[in-house]
């Protein structure tokens, strides 16, 4: 079985993009409240043996910034007259909370992933400014070194001439 190639090469991604993708991946993997299993830190062998479960489409709606379709939400809920009504009411409350969070994220226009990407972008820009400042300082220091080198050479020549003149006199 051959592995598929990636649609991009790693060389084309900047460090802040990779960091933002990593943060997004960590958020998805650790989302215990959305129906996925919690990814435990290394060393917990019991948790490592569990298989990561797939999240339902309603809980992933915030990723695509689309509202879940009513058919998806109502198909997962049970009628209040069923024997499991206490469990279904809890599930409905959790779904309503998830939908409320989705709406809040849409209204505010800022998701944790976007905030992380924005921080990374700002950090990248700050690093670029620092690089420019350091390059400027480096150039200034090179010019200073050249000036001091010329001064040392002139002093050395003057000292040699003086020594030669002392021996001749």
UniProtKB/Swiss-Prot annotation:
Ranges annotated as biased composition (Low complexity): 74-89
Q: Biased-composition ranges for Basic and acidic residues?
A: 119-139
Tell me which InterPro entries the record gives.
bZIP, DNA_damage_induc_transcript_3
Region called Leucine-zipper, residue ranges: 134-148
Residue numbers spanned by region Interaction with TRIB3:
10-18
Residues bearing PTM Phosphoserine: 14-15, 30-31, 79, 82
Gene Ontology MF terms: cAMP response element binding protein binding; DNA binding; DNA-binding transcription activator activity, RNA polymerase II-specific; DNA-binding transcription factor activity; DNA-binding transcription factor activity, RNA polymerase II-specific; identical protein binding; leucine zipper domain binding; protein heterodimerization activity
bZIP domain mapped to chain residues: 99-162
Q: Which residues does the annotated region (N-terminal) include?
A: 10-26
One GO cellular component this record assigns the protein to is: cytoplasm
Name any Gene Ontology BP term: PERK-mediated unfolded protein response
On induction, the UniProt comment says: Up-regulated by oxidative stress, amino-acid deprivation, hypoxia and endoplasmic reticulum stress. During ER stress, induced by a EIF2AK3/ATF4 pathway and/or ERN1/ATF6 pathway. Expression is suppressed by TLR-TRIF signaling pathway during prolonged ER stress.
Annotated segments matching region Disordered: 32-139
Oligomeric and partner information = Heterodimer. Interacts with TCF7L2/TCF4, EP300/P300, HDAC1, HDAC5 and HDAC6. Interacts with TRIB3 which blocks its association with EP300/P300. Interacts with FOXO3, CEBPB and ATF4.
User: What is the associated disease?
Assistant: Myxoid liposarcoma: A soft tissue tumor that tends to occur in the limbs (especially the thigh) of patients ranging in age from 35 to 55 years. It is defined by the presence of a hypocellular spindle cell proliferation set in a myxoid background, often with mucin pooling. Lipoblasts tend to be small and often monovacuolated and to cluster around vessels or at the periphery of the lesion.
What is written about domains in the entry's comments?
The N-terminal region is necessary for its proteasomal degradation, transcriptional activity and interaction with EP300/P300.
Protein function? Multifunctional transcription factor in endoplasmic reticulum (ER) stress response. Plays an essential role in the response to a wide variety of cell stresses and induces cell cycle arrest and apoptosis in response to ER stress. Plays a dual role both as an inhibitor of CCAAT/enhancer-binding protein (C/EBP) function and as an activator of other genes. Acts as a dominant-negative regulator of C/EBP-induced transcription: dimerizes with members of the C/EBP family, impairs their association with C/EBP binding sites in the promoter regions, and inhibits the expression of C/EBP regulated genes.
The record's similarity note reads:
Belongs to the bZIP family.
Q: What is the name of this protein?
A: DNA damage-inducible transcript 3 protein
**Native source organism of the sequence:** Homo sapiens
């Amino acid at each position: 079985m051959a592995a598929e190639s990636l649609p991009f090469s790693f060389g084309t991604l900047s460090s802040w993009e990779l960091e933002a993708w990593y943060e997004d991946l960590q958020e998805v993997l650790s989302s215990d409240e959305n129906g996925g299993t919690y990814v435990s830190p290394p060393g917990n062998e019991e948790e490592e043996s569990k298989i990561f479960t797939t999240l339902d489409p309603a809980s992933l709606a915030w990723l695509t910034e689309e509202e879940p379709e009513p058919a998806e939400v109502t198909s997962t809920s049970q009628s209040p007259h069923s024997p499991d009504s206490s469990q279904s009411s809890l599930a409905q409350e959790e779904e309503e909370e998830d939908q409320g969070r989705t709406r809040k994220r849409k209204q505010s226009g800022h998701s944790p992933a976007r905030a992380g990407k924005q921080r990374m972008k700002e950090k990248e820009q700050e690093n670029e400014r620092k690089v420019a400042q350091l390059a400027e300082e480096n150039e200034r220091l090179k010019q200073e070194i050249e000036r001091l080198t010329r001064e040392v050479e002139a002093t050395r020549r003057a000292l040699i001439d003086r020594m030669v003149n002392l021996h001749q006199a």
